[in-house]
Amino acid sequence: MPSASWEDLAADKRARLEKSIPDEWKFKSVPIEGSVIDLPEKSGILSPSEIKITNSSATELVAQLANGTLKSVDVTLAFCKRAALAHQLVNCAHDFFPELALAQARELDRYFETHKKPVGPLHGLPISLKDQLRVKGTETCMAYISWLGKRDTSDSILTALLRKAGAVFLVKTSVPQTLMVCETVNNIIGRTSNPRNLNLSCGGSSGGEGAMIAMRGGAIGIGTDIGGSIRVPAAFNSLYGIRPSHGRLPYGGMTNSMEGQETIHSVVGPIAHSAQDVRLFLQSVLKEEPWKYDSKVIPLPWREAEENAAQAKIAEKSLNFAFYDFDGVVRPHPPITRGVEIVRSTLEKDGHTVAPWTPYKHAFAVDLANKIYAADGSTDVYKHINASGEPAIPNIKDLMNPNLPKADLNEVWDAQLQKWRYQCEYLDKWREWEERTGKELDAIIAPVAATAAVRHNQFRYYGYATVFNVLDYTSVVVPVTYADKAVDHRLADYQPVSDMDKAVYAEYDPEVYHGAPVAVQIIGRRLSEERTLAIAEYVGKLLGH
């Protein structure tokens, strides 16, 4: 019997996904352009109480679940319905399993009724997962058609720890083929769009998470980041997200492209509507002591002392920031430079020190990262692509090219040395800033990307995010504003510094980008999650979040 074509396998997956949504949760029709972010609330499918539940913060929900005000089954049902609506509007799910979620919720309610207490800090909280995390009994395809039809027989370590903490899993979200793209498109479900404008990208590779959380189809989402894949979707969807340093959270048991590539690590982290919810996630996971289950995790519990140190400087209005709005390689679009200026001026008016930062060898770092990502000649990703006969998506052709030569072992070792030397040199620059200003540098303010949420197929330059993957610095995304055609005009005297710079700037159209989310990243040193998140939360509060 002949094997099924890749088209048939993809069609079968889409049919199964469609069948997983009950008819009573379906729209009669959906728009193909414009904003859809408010449509779930206007659908008539969600009750007033379900709208209230899904609009609540994760922090609010766990408090009400812990004191018995809310039942897990009611919260889970509300988020299942909203996740189903989100997928119909922006195409953001790979696997949807409301029956498993509701069964898990009922078990949690029975536990609470018997023991009069929650099972853990995330008791009954619905969490959305990027399609890299394994959940026993569900399908993980990671956008490869050749992976379809296989059920997970166990949880990833992070999934297991979240389950132990009381989290409920309801959906796995879309990713781009290979993961190595800051947009989300694949041959299985097609393209995932931005809820605020269907003509714009949701980002990637955790783009399905960004879109799902923006639509409030999960209380918190989990993404991964090897070159901006948490931060870009958070920025493009006006959300908070953290790229923790390698070794802080468990990655064990998750799927990935280029497994065994250990020079630049992919890390896992949350995407949420507030810094408070990001903190809830981090504290809850670290409370489970993940270093006992994943040998790559550093035995480092949540450090309140670090958080308190940042809070003390906040109270004294003595924070010290560096900032830049141009990395010397690609000039950001006007909405992005305005976003950096809003943050700079807001902090300065509040009494803090904000001084310029000179980006150090960012072009070198980006080039090094690209060489590392393609060191195997793209053998790994094309093995999975070719196994089904599906074509490679056009978006990966520059980075993941099967015609690129493989690096030999000496070249890999040399790349690792170059990375380490660059990390040391960047630390030198950090100390030089402190010596020059006479102040401790608390964080750097920088763009996340050169553009606001970008038009489909137009994300070209990864450098603003990728450099901090090379450095392994902690980075938190803070939403700032939205592109405004009335003020974000093209620069009349703009002169490109490179072909890439010219191509990126040529993409800017004030009319097209009007209303697109704008964010910055707050960057701290390696393993500075507590301090950096506290500072990012404060920045958000100053901005009115």
Curated annotation (Swiss-Prot):
Active site: 130, 205, 229
Gene3D superfamilies in the cross-refs: Amidase signature (AS) domain
Enzyme class: hydrolase
Its job: Allows acetamide to be used as a sole carbon or nitrogen source.
UniProt protein name: Acetamidase
Name of the encoding gene: amdS
Family: Belongs to the amidase family.
Coiled-coil regions listed in the entry: none
Keywords: Hydrolase
